[in-house]
């Protein structure tokens, strides 16, 4: 979007036509409200940017099908020129005509017709240039089908539009609709407006609507429309004095038969504009992020760098995009409905005044005044930015232009910076509503994303603090590493040819997050269908499983006007977090995933794990929808956004920690109930505090050794050429345990049956060495470096017999031989190291032996005794022998 500059923001409101509540559609579902349909169609209008068009910003839905549209606005319009009742100069008329045609031509390229062209919808900016307003009303209302008022103004409607009339459907049954207006209807409207400017007066003012319509239709019987109009309004002398090129424009615009009338594109190329057209440079839309074109191709720097700032005064807010300004306006307390009420655009009527005078037994009523609220009041109310500017008055200019390269520690910090640092410690819900904080975060992320992928590392760093909601869609794409010609790739996929999956997709979409106005709109359904189908077609080795629609929902919502980016994000997300989950036979993948999840429950909450296992409430009964949809099936979108903000920063094992965190929030209820009650509890999941869930899942993730969540069916490591780039940009906690380099100390795959038989997870020798802070000799490497002063995070319990232990053991480990470790009742036998084991309860306990079955049994006993964070060394003591890290106790003399 363009910067706000000298423009303002305006809002206008109208009602969509209401539908009966007792009528269903052909699919048996209730009819989609017309306001929802309009809201869905409106979204594409936000992407249409041109210097001759007022930028659409937002649409909000109120009660009783009310819609409020926010768009760029200018106070002056051609209506003001006509009020002066003076003919406009010929050169000005030519410039106005050409600029209007520029806007209309750009709209036509995007398949949009204005249809509501009139002097008060042709605005003038501070420099006197044209901006077309309300050009999307005809498009968003489905050519007027979804509202009870006509689109357009009788004096300016083309004859072919008037001839079709305004049909109304009865009982909401589709009838034969008139053909939608084409680009040529706008050319007629422009002709009438130019005629009015030339003569300095408005036409048809003395005629009522029916007479105007009749007069316009009779123009088809005359030879010269211009002369007839001039004679009718007593301005023939003025018309005769017009230069030939202006007369030619008027004649071409006011050609009665549309087949002979030029389109805006044809008229722009006409010889009459030969002197005007060189004054204007063709508009080239700037390349957006993730576009295939080179973003810096048209970048030119002036010789004097100060020239960049010559047009910038102290109004830094005006340099931000109109979308950002509106978002901040809302945060600063802006209320659209309140603004419209203050200007008396919205008037409340006492209910008693709406009662009929007579009411018969059959329900027929009489004496009710006509409700005129359903008609269009196209008054645009200017939204005051005073409250926002007052809120941001203490924000310095440097906040609008953050330095990304300089060392911030050497720069002086203002009070504003100190306040921001304090704000960063506040709860996320408060930060997201803090105007000043969001301004700084939006500007910072905007700068970083413009430098993507060069600034990928810094995007990761800032995303760990928080992600501003306005920048979430692009930030997620950056975190997922989306790059390349995503639009060309998406466009090349066949999304039209019928496939067997179509039927299931059609069934699932109307059930997917339909509480959301955007996703429940017909436009949302169509986009859902295309993105899902594109994914299915482009992944022939995978299949569509129910739940894929829920997985698609967050990406589609954030990138509603960019299906290619939604598809690219989804295609990058699934291999990372749900690798092979969508195979036709995915049982082995799901079973391994759920087994590892069971081990994670036992690792972090043994008491809960013991209880769930005793009552037979296994993850297969409740967790498959969690992980298959990455929680999008169980949480609403606003919770998913905060959850995924953190999920995307972690590796593929982070979902396990989210799952455990959810169970821990329900812990008391689960421990107090049996199998049937737990089933009922999960059939309608109780309210989950998502901020607490995120916080606890991060804590669980930090306590989990990386290799404890190893899965043989996880995404295989990328080739060395790619992985080196990924490793250099991704933080340690987002790296996978399977990432290279793979050594002899890494975890090995084991059969699923063996994995299921073990209650506690295995960790690799690599992780053990890392957590014990041991020094490795030879060619072995550890993934991280720890300081020598830090306390050990774990206790190694060696369960071999004492003779083997004396021959060589891990430094700092304790010996509890398996044969004498537990009593007949299953309690831990008292011994010299029992107290030490008890003191380490709560820290990581690694069970080491040389017989895998014994180590698994020992770990299971500890879990039964409610010892948390118990795990097994993969490969046993034999994995450690080649490292030279085993120590032998000094002989006692």
UniProtKB/Swiss-Prot annotation:
SMART domains: RHOD, TBC. InterPro entries: Kinase-like_dom_sf (IPR011009), Prot_kinase_dom (IPR000719), Rab-GAP-TBC_dom (IPR000195), Rab-GAP_TBC_sf (IPR035969), Rhodanese-like_dom (IPR001763), Rhodanese-like_dom_sf (IPR036873). Gene3D superfamilies: putative rabgap domain of human tbc1 domain family member 14 like domains, Rhodanese-like domain, Transferase(Phosphotransferase) domain 1, Ypt/Rab-GAP domain of gyp1p, domain 3. Keywords: Cytoplasm, Cytoskeleton, Endosome. One of its GO terms (biological process) is regulation of TOR signaling. One of its GO terms (cellular component) is early endosome. Pfam families: Pkinase (PF00069), RabGAP-TBC (PF00566), Rhodanese (PF00581). It is found in: Cytoplasm; Cytoplasm, Cytoskeleton, Spindle; Midbody; Early endosome. It comes from the Eukaryota. Component of the FERRY complex (Five-subunit Endosomal Rab5 and RNA/ribosome intermediary). The FERRY complex directly interacts with mRNAs and RAB5A, and functions as a RAB5A effector involved in the localization and the distribution of specific mRNAs most likely by mediating their endosomal transport. The complex recruits mRNAs and ribosomes to early endosomes through direct mRNA-interaction. Also involved in the modulation of mTOR signaling and expression of mTOR complex components. Involved in the control of actin-cytoskeleton organization. Belongs to the protein kinase superfamily. The protein kinase domain is predicted to be catalytically inactive. Component of the FERRY complex composed of five subunits, TBCK, PPP1R21, FERRY3, CRYZL1 and GATD1 with a ratio of 1:2:1:2:4, respectively. This is TBC domain-containing protein kinase-like protein. It comes from Mus musculus. The lineage of its organism: Eukaryota, Metazoa, Chordata, Craniata, Vertebrata. The gene is Tbck.
